[in-house]
Amino acid sequence: MFKHVTVLLEETVDGLDIKPNGTYVDCTLGGGGHSSYLLSQLTEGGKLIAFDQDEIAIQNAKDKFSSYGEQFIAVKSNFRYLSEKLHELGITEVDGILFDLGVSSPQLDTPERGFSYHHDAPLDMRMDQEAPLTAYDVVNNWSYEQLVRIFFQYGEEKFSKQIARKIEAYREKKKIETTGELVELIKEGIPAPARRTGGHPAKRVFQAIRIAVNDELKVFEEALEAAIEIVKPGGRISVITFHSLEDRICKTTFKRNSTTPELPPGLPIIPEEFKPKLKLITRKPILPSDVELEENNRARSAKLRIAEKR
């Protein structure tokens, strides 16, 4: 069963300031938590289009929301194709868009998907199981320098070089086939005192490989820019991030689009192309409450930012 505890549920959807007859997009359907709450606030004229690249998530949502008929449309696609897929549906503007950038718990908890360092499984980590690049390819074929870069940039791993050296030495003798093998190599690359602090020693490297396999940061950056263009004036965008790099992309994109650039003094009016596109609804990110953190440990790194189209 596709179960998933939704993070910052009400804050994210209520932050969109739902119009009951509006058209909305959930870019990250997952277990359907945000979609379910959003659909419950729509009248017959309202519509929700939900994206996911996971076939199981799509089928689950079609069953779960079948009573909504044509009000709910599930699109099996990466949200990097947000504009194209909406245009195919004849939709050129919407009233609100939400992103929840966490990996859905069913993906983490399904051992054979290879996302988890708690289960031994083939090295996969693809959110779209038809995509060509896998974690196996990254771990076995990428150069030492490439591995160091992603471990450091995407995982903020202090021992990136040591871990990459262990991987490089091991794969000269034998291909690294499973998550279990990779976990052991990561542990060998981290000094014993450091292994005992800061959660599971493989956490940061697994995150880095997952981001690389799915090209997550570039995809999000492009999709957020597209969302700003698609949302109507007065419409809103809600974004939940779980990683400092994702949050930085969201923060800087929102800030850049909500401020007026420095213009030559004495201009009688601000040219239209220089007027800010957005108004920030959240100056600082909204964080999960203590109650939510007690109920769902995976929410601990979540941050919610909301902006409104001018």
Curated annotation (Swiss-Prot):
S-adenosyl-L-methionine binds at residues 32-34, 52, 79, 100, 107. Its EC number is 2.1.1.199. It comes from Bacillus cytotoxicus (strain DSM 22905 / CIP 110041 / 391-98 / NVH 391-98). It is an enzyme of class 2 (transferase). Belongs to the methyltransferase superfamily. RsmH family. InterPro entries: RsmH (IPR002903), SAM-dep_MeTrfase_MraW_recog (IPR023397), SAM-dependent_MTases_sf (IPR029063). Its main location: cytoplasm. It catalyses: cytidine(1402) in 16S rRNA + S-adenosyl-L-methionine = N(4)-methylcytidine(1402) in 16S rRNA + S-adenosyl-L-homocysteine + H(+). HAMAP family: 16SrRNA_methyltr_H. Specifically methylates the N4 position of cytidine in position 1402 (C1402) of 16S rRNA. GO terms for cellular component: cytoplasm. The lineage of its organism: Bacteria, Bacillati, Bacillota, Bacilli, Bacillales. This is Ribosomal RNA small subunit methyltransferase H. NCBIfam families: 16S rRNA (cytosine(1402)-N(4))-methyltransferase RsmH (TIGR00006). It is found in: Cytoplasm. The keyword rRNA processing applies. GO terms for molecular function: rRNA (cytosine-N4-)-methyltransferase activity. Keywords: Cytoplasm, Methyltransferase, rRNA processing, S-adenosyl-L-methionine, Transferase. The keyword rRNA processing applies. GO terms for biological process: rRNA base methylation. It holds the Pfam family Methyltransf_5.
